[in-house]
Amino acid sequence: MKTIKVKNKTEGSKVAFRMLEEEITFGAKTLGLATGSTPLELYKEIRESHLDFSDMVSINLDEYVGLSADDKQSYAYFMKQNLFAAKPFKKSYLPNGLAADLAKETEYYDQILAQYPIDLQILGIGRNAHIGFNEPGTAFSSQTHLVDLTPSTIAANSRFFEKAEDVPKQAISMGLASIMSAKMILLMAFGEEKAEAVAAMVKGPVTEEIPASILQTHPKVILIVDEKAGAGI
């Protein structure tokens, strides 16, 4: 795991953009994408760039169960607003949170991941060191699966909803083994609220109680942190 410390999120996002641009130059065809506040400035850099994704595939980490793609709180809507409307891909995949058979949807998503191996996976990290919606205790061997969100994750995401009761209680997420299958992983973390999780990920034991700790065993992980998020490493 290579760590790059930057002054702030803006600088970190520019560094991440240059790395993504380089990987595309070297032939990357499939990007794994994340949502949330962490990658927003990276997506802004991409929108304002010369990059063309019309011959590339994107695969998102996760989606809430019960929200349509047109729901403003869905990750499908987030991606459309923040990236896809400006920079369309040849194909873009997100889990279908309205699938009638959620088990079949997870199997279908695994088939997509097998068909389009991810060259570069963009990640953030949760305060409890979750990646995707893989909460503490998730098996390192997990593939795409249905997740019951923890109270802490629901609370953290409630700021995006009118009231906490509106936050979905389940999501479909790529599993930890799914994430680890990416050829390269670029994880960004900014702000002091992420410092404990970053320290546990980098310096802690490799244990399923710290989902992101599995990244210690990946051959090519780049960690971009600002001074506050990287205070413990």
Curated annotation (Swiss-Prot):
Which Gene Ontology CC terms are recorded? Answer: cytoplasm
Keyword Hydrolase applies? yes
Q: In which pathway does it act?
A: Amino-sugar metabolism; N-acetylneuraminate degradation; D-fructose 6-phosphate from N-acetylneuraminate: step 5/5
Q: Which GO terms describe its molecular function?
A: glucosamine-6-phosphate deaminase activity; identical protein binding
Give the top-rank taxon of the lineage listed in the UniProt record for this protein: Bacteria
Give the record's GO biological process terms: amino sugar metabolic process; carbohydrate metabolic process; glucosamine catabolic process; N-acetylglucosamine catabolic process; N-acetylneuraminate catabolic process
Swiss-Prot/TrEMBL catalytic activity? alpha-D-glucosamine 6-phosphate + H2O = beta-D-fructose 6-phosphate + NH4(+)
EC number of the protein: 3.5.99.6
One Pfam family of this chain: Glucosamine_iso
Active-site residue numbers: D62 (proton acceptor), N128 (for ring-opening step), H130 (proton acceptor), E135 (for ring-opening step)
Q: Which UniProt keywords apply?
A: Carbohydrate metabolism, Hydrolase
Q: What is stated as this protein's family in its record?
A: Belongs to the glucosamine/galactosamine-6-phosphate isomerase family. NagB subfamily.
Q: What functional role does this protein have?
A: Catalyzes the reversible isomerization-deamination of glucosamine 6-phosphate (GlcN6P) to form fructose 6-phosphate (Fru6P) and ammonium ion.
PANTHER family found in the cross-reference section: GLUCOSAMINE-6-PHOSPHATE ISOMERASE
Question: Any idea what this protein is called?
Answer: Glucosamine-6-phosphate deaminase
Which organism's genome codes for this protein?
Streptococcus mutans serotype c (strain ATCC 700610 / UA159)
